[in-house]
Amino acid sequence: MSKMNKLEHIRNIGICAHIDAGKTTTTERILYYTGKSHKIGEVHDGGATMDWMEQEQERGITITSAATTCRWQDKIINIIDTPGHVDFTIEVERSLRVLDGAVAVFDGVAGVEPQSETVWRQADKYNVPRMCFVNKMDRMGADFYRCVEMIKDRLGAKPLVLQLPVGIEENFKGIIDLVKMKAVIWKDESLGAEYCEEDIPADMKDKAEEYRAKLLDMVVELDDTIMEKYLSGEEVTEEEIKRLIRKGTISAAFYPVLCGSAFKNKGVQPLLDAVVYFLPSPIDIGIVKGIEVSTGEEKDFPVSVIEPFAALAFKIMNDPFVGSLTFIRIYSGKIASGITVINTVKNKKEKIGRMLLMHANNREDVKEASAGDIVALAGLKDTTTGDTLSDVDKQVILERMEFPEPVIELAVEPKSTADQEKMGLALSRLAAEDPSFRVSMDHETGQTVIKGMGELHLEIIIDRMRREFKVEANIGAPQVAYRETITKACEIDYTHKKQSGGAGQFARVKIIFEPLKEVKDLEDEDKNKTFVFASKIVGGAVPKEYIPGVEKGLNNIRETGVIAGYPMIDFKATLVDGAFHDVDSSVLAFEIAAKAAFREGMPKGDPKLLEPIMKVEVITPDEYMGDIIGDLNSRRGQIQSMDPRGNAQVVTANVPLAEMFGYVNTLRSLSQGRAQFSMIFSHYDQVPSQVADIIKAKK
């Protein structure tokens, strides 16, 4: 197979879903039918191939996106298994950045759940073409048609139904293929490996005709010639329909919807066929955006084997046998063991040692890899998630990934002196793997503080510290990651002078601080930042070489705000004037001046305390609804919506994270264990003054 031809044969896909929608089971079945896995792993018994960290096998949830390579027909499918729990959305975000297409798995009973919405929005952000697989069609209460409506209403997406279920709940036995207009029925005794095509059952003929007409109406819109043919009553061929479905899927004109039951081994092979037929190859994506290092200009780089090498590191993992593994997606060029490449973000060279193709936790050594491939590199020294590896002579930086701020933190203390050093190493390794996990030192108490996206996230980090690094630690109670901000603009003119014999220090800075939301001319790249620095110095009032000192000083000091010592966010600092001394000025002097200007100036900006607000969704039987809403209101919650779902009610509310600790036990007792909830970070908002006073008093 020629190299360019090989690109057409690759599918880099992710399988994304809400926790428990059956995503890992679906991936397992794909590996089974593509011949990479000889025994079907079940999440229920902790034996799934993709869930390979011990914690995942115990909890039955997928934490790490393991990359797996398999083949179907003549295509290579690289699957990134993404976690479905809200605390791990960072993993999903990372994998979506390097995918060409995705399969969104929905629970046929629950439909579109909160995490499904979150993942869908993340996929929108990266323009990932995707198709939908409505799973669990064999379960009590499964409703394919309701799920399709929810995809339309909740996600605002345009579903293109390609299959209908044959039989419902425990009688589910197959699908109707609306492209071929045939029924596909599975034989239970063959573990789903054997199925046969039959005529459409008589009682489903009308429904199949109705949905076939809807399908044709949607796809022919993409091609004027075929539309004329269709409108004049001519038959549209199967090949033409498939070509148009592919075109519409890649352009996100619509999202194909398939159905099945992965657990009962039904519907997996047609899903694989659809991945191959309809999801894009790296060539269909065509270009990747990046910055040419030599000119600093943003450019579009073609995805091609003959272009210079460029790859994005999207995951770092510690492997017990190989050590640190860096997963990369190669966008252009090729790479071989023994060559040297450059990390253009850190400006450090890296020598390529072992290269591995991963199959969950089995590995296969390869000597070279090229555009379109996803491989793991062993032994890289300086590369972390989001970095670009590039050809040394033709350097590029691919667009960086953005990572959310952690919302929860807790103190950890090693149990013994022996654990002290090991803990430092363990935490720095875990932070290199996971950019949404941060480690810092509390300057007042001297404690190590770890920060993450939720209680489960930090629980698993501590668990991994114990299991993988053999570190025993005492854990403090979880704390909310409060922030501070200013609500009005203010200006400060500060002069730092130090004369005590020998070389002195001198720096004068005039800085305007303003809330980000009031800044009119914010650059696009600054819109997602929490702090923006700009210099409007003219005429050399502050020499160029000293300006980075001002930015560094502000960046350091903003970590301890002026109200209660929490990090200061959502503000812009503009250096507008200043003065220097030929002998006594230095970068350090300007750094000190900037810090003092912050301390003196920020209190004039009417600073306020901010707290993380969570989007909480509670699913409850009708009879507990009143009590649950009353309880959410008592937690300073704001009810956003109440919707019926089957015979239950879904309550969505925005609630401060500080009020949600221990909610799982309250909900259990309010509903006799029948209600469930999920929550995800929504935004930061001002803390009411009476609550802010209590928080300040505790600091």
Curated annotation (Swiss-Prot):
Keyword Amino-acid biosynthesis assigned: no
Q: Which Pfam families match?
A: EF-G_D2 (PF22042), EFG_C (PF00679), EFG_III (PF14492), EFG_IV (PF03764), GTP_EFTU (PF00009)
> Which compartment or compartments is the protein found in?
Cytoplasm
Cite the GO molecular-function annotations of the record. Answer: GTP binding; GTPase activity; translation elongation factor activity
Keywords, in A-Z order? Cytoplasm, Elongation factor, GTP-binding, Nucleotide-binding, Protein biosynthesis
The UniProt entry, under InterPro entries, shows:
EF-G-like_DII, EFG_II, EFG_III, EFG_III/V, EFG_IV, EFG_V, EFG_V-like, G_TR_CS
BP GO terms, sorted: ribosome disassembly
Boundaries of every tr-type G domain copy: 8-283
Q: What is its main location?
A: cytoplasm
Per the record's keyword annotation, is Glycoprotein included, yes or no? no
Query: What's in the GO CC field?
Result: cytoplasm
Where, by residue number, does GTP bind? 17-24, 81-85, 135-138
Q: Which HAMAP family match?
A: EF_G_EF_2_B
State the similarity comment.
Answer: Belongs to the TRAFAC class translation factor GTPase superfamily. Classic translation factor GTPase family. EF-G/EF-2 subfamily.
Briefly state the protein's biological role. Catalyzes the GTP-dependent ribosomal translocation step during translation elongation. During this step, the ribosome changes from the pre-translocational (PRE) to the post-translocational (POST) state as the newly formed A-site-bound peptidyl-tRNA and P-site-bound deacylated tRNA move to the P and E sites, respectively. Catalyzes the coordinated movement of the two tRNA molecules, the mRNA and conformational changes in the ribosome.
| Protein name (record) | Elongation factor G
